[in-house]
Amino acid sequence: MNDSSLSPEVTADLEYGLDILELDRVYVVPLLAYLTLLIRWNRTYNLTAIRDPREMVVRHLLDSLAIQRYVTVGRLADLGSGPGLPGIPLAISCPSLQVTLVESNGKKARFLREVVRQLGLSNVGVSEVRAEALDEALTYEHLTARALDTLNGIVTVGGHLLKSEGTLLAMKGAYPHEEIAMLPPHWVVEAVHPLQVPKLTGKRHLVIVRKR
């Protein structure tokens, strides 16, 4: 995938972010290939409101990769994946992780399949269904959700997918006190980690939830 249309600053921002996150720069090429596809398809399909490539690096790629250390192996379902976030950056940076991108919107699912095809991501599948309709109960070690719903909403539609010891990794902005308080009694918050996303201002938290 040709990323020659991207400015040197875009590459530099990504390399800097990978260094801060202690991730190998070998991922620069596939991540920029994904970014190039996202920019191209976004002109027609409006996959994301963010248009500036440098902002995309920070708010999409580096934000997704900030949770990479928590999901290096096993099977992961990315619920409401949208344009593939955080699922595709995680799959690129964790080749041993098997990722299912769950996205019911047809246009977004077509984009995801094209990314998988062009980047040759053998560890990624796309399920064009709503999370609650995915018939794969007790299959996944991890669920991710970046902008899908409240914690209660996420476990309601996708909790059945987790293995008994599996974890939901929900990406949030400010510390979600109210959402945590509203979790059903058979779910418990294992940890809340502040996320340091390179070049991003504003609060980010990763909430890890598991079944009791």
Swiss-Prot record:
Its EC number is 2.1.1.170. S-adenosyl-L-methionine binds at G80, L85, A131, E132, R146. This is Ribosomal RNA small subunit methyltransferase G. It catalyses: guanosine(527) in 16S rRNA + S-adenosyl-L-methionine = N(7)-methylguanosine(527) in 16S rRNA + S-adenosyl-L-homocysteine. Keywords: Cytoplasm, Methyltransferase, rRNA processing, S-adenosyl-L-methionine, Transferase. Belongs to the methyltransferase superfamily. RNA methyltransferase RsmG family. The gene is rsmG. The keyword S-adenosyl-L-methionine applies. GO terms for cellular component: cytosol. It is found in: Cytoplasm. It comes from the Bacteria. One of its GO terms (molecular function) is rRNA (guanine-N7-)-methyltransferase activity. Signal peptide: none annotated. Specifically methylates the N7 position of guanine in position 527 of 16S rRNA. NCBIfam families: rsmG_gidB.
